[in-house]
């Protein structure tokens, strides 16, 4: 039986790409698409949606996720902006409802592997900085992927305070790691994690060329979320 899917944010840039690609997935049925003016809860109920893919805005994503869970569907969220406290609250709601949810700062499998390898490298290289580069329309900085990468690396290191540099050009500190953000036309989605040690450096880099790079991860999440009864944060936890 096919999984009934709603795309929330269907008129957005990535929502349109998901719509174009989902028809090729024989086990996923697009039953509706919603936007800012639509009643999401009512749409979930009338379409009997199993999964809602959310690519909306940082301002609305937490409210959207609560609506999805309370309406009995499973959120697959690619919208950035959720805090760790909000993610914990959503996980509690999922467990109460026995519903799965997936929140991923990046649905690109390549980007997730980059984060995974960076975490492994942190065993051997204590000094690291992150450079993330995106198109000029990207709203948030640092990116959700960069913040998640810093969190994963931070798990392998002794605790470091997020004390800001006196010189702001040295970047914003997350989990004790400097992050540098670049926003320019001509870029899409790029991140380098640069480790340094005596006499050597190690760079782990991912380049996303367009939004199609996220499609395999999004559709994998739609399938995996049906097997869960709690929230999973990060696509790396599904690989």
Swiss-Prot record:
<feature type="binding site">
    <location>
        <position position="135"/>
    </location>
    <ligand>
        <name>(S)-2,3,4,5-tetrahydrodipicolinate</name>
    </ligand>
</feature>
<keyword id="KW-0457">Lysine biosynthesis</keyword>
<dbReference type="GO" id="GO:0009089">
    <property type="term" value="P:lysine biosynthetic process via diaminopimelate"/>
</dbReference>
<dbReference type="InterPro" id="IPR036291">
    <property type="entry name" value="NAD(P)-bd_dom_sf"/>
</dbReference>
<feature type="binding site">
    <location>
        <begin position="144"/>
        <end position="145"/>
    </location>
    <ligand>
        <name>(S)-2,3,4,5-tetrahydrodipicolinate</name>
    </ligand>
</feature>
<dbReference type="GO" id="GO:0016726">
    <property type="term" value="F:oxidoreductase activity, acting on CH or CH2 groups, NAD or NADP as acceptor"/>
</dbReference>
<keyword id="KW-0520">NAD</keyword>
<dbReference type="GO" id="GO:0050661">
    <property type="term" value="F:NADP binding"/>
</dbReference>
<dbReference type="InterPro" id="IPR022664">
    <property type="entry name" value="DapB_N_CS"/>
</dbReference>
<dbReference type="Pfam" id="PF05173">
    <property type="entry name" value="DapB_C"/>
</dbReference>
<feature type="active site" description="Proton donor">
    <location>
        <position position="138"/>
    </location>
</feature>
<keyword id="KW-0560">Oxidoreductase</keyword>
<dbReference type="InterPro" id="IPR022663">
    <property type="entry name" value="DapB_C"/>
</dbReference>
<dbReference type="GO" id="GO:0008839">
    <property type="term" value="F:4-hydroxy-tetrahydrodipicolinate reductase"/>
</dbReference>
<protein>
    <recommendedName>
        <fullName>4-hydroxy-tetrahydrodipicolinate reductase</fullName>
        <ecNumber>1.17.1.8</ecNumber>
    </recommendedName>
</protein>
<feature type="binding site">
    <location>
        <begin position="78"/>
        <end position="80"/>
    </location>
    <ligand>
        <name>NAD(+)</name>
    </ligand>
</feature>
<comment type="function">
    <text>Catalyzes the conversion of 4-hydroxy-tetrahydrodipicolinate (HTPA) to tetrahydrodipicolinate.</text>
</comment>
<dbReference type="Pfam" id="PF01113">
    <property type="entry name" value="DapB_N"/>
</dbReference>
<dbReference type="GO" id="GO:0019877">
    <property type="term" value="P:diaminopimelate biosynthetic process"/>
</dbReference>
<keyword id="KW-0521">NADP</keyword>
<dbReference type="GO" id="GO:0051287">
    <property type="term" value="F:NAD binding"/>
</dbReference>
<keyword id="KW-0963">Cytoplasm</keyword>
<keyword id="KW-0220">Diaminopimelate biosynthesis</keyword>
<keyword id="KW-0028">Amino-acid biosynthesis</keyword>
<dbReference type="InterPro" id="IPR023940">
    <property type="entry name" value="DHDPR_bac"/>
</dbReference>
<dbReference type="GO" id="GO:0005829">
    <property type="term" value="C:cytosol"/>
</dbReference>
<comment type="similarity">
    <text>Belongs to the DapB family.</text>
</comment>
<feature type="binding site">
    <location>
        <begin position="104"/>
        <end position="107"/>
    </location>
    <ligand>
        <name>NAD(+)</name>
    </ligand>
</feature>
<feature type="active site" description="Proton donor/acceptor">
    <location>
        <position position="134"/>
    </location>
</feature>
<comment type="pathway">
    <text>Amino-acid biosynthesis; L-lysine biosynthesis via DAP pathway; (S)-tetrahydrodipicolinate from L-aspartate: step 4/4.</text>
</comment>
<feature type="binding site">
    <location>
        <begin position="9"/>
        <end position="14"/>
    </location>
    <ligand>
        <name>NAD(+)</name>
    </ligand>
</feature>
<dbReference type="InterPro" id="IPR000846">
    <property type="entry name" value="DapB_N"/>
</dbReference>
